[in-house]
């Protein structure tokens, strides 16, 4: 998966 996208989503989720 895209680490950048995943990280962004993860941050947004939190």
UniProtKB/Swiss-Prot annotation:
<comment type="function">
    <text>Removal of H(2)O(2), oxidation of toxic reductants, biosynthesis and degradation of lignin, suberization, auxin catabolism, response to environmental stresses such as wounding, pathogen attack and oxidative stress. These functions might be dependent on each isozyme/isoform in each plant tissue.</text>
</comment>
<protein>
    <recommendedName>
        <fullName>Peroxidase 1</fullName>
        <ecNumber>1.11.1.7</ecNumber>
    </recommendedName>
</protein>
<comment type="similarity">
    <text>Belongs to the peroxidase family. Classical plant (class III) peroxidase subfamily.</text>
</comment>
<keyword id="KW-0575">Peroxidase</keyword>
<keyword id="KW-0560">Oxidoreductase</keyword>
<keyword id="KW-0408">Iron</keyword>
<keyword id="KW-0349">Heme</keyword>
<dbReference type="GO" id="GO:0046872">
    <property type="term" value="F:metal ion binding"/>
</dbReference>
<dbReference type="GO" id="GO:0140825">
    <property type="term" value="F:lactoperoxidase activity"/>
</dbReference>
<keyword id="KW-0479">Metal-binding</keyword>
<keyword id="KW-0376">Hydrogen peroxide</keyword>
<keyword id="KW-0106">Calcium</keyword>
<dbReference type="GO" id="GO:0042744">
    <property type="term" value="P:hydrogen peroxide catabolic process"/>
</dbReference>
């Amino acid at each position: 998966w895209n680490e950048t996208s995943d990280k962004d989503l993860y941050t947004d989720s939190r």
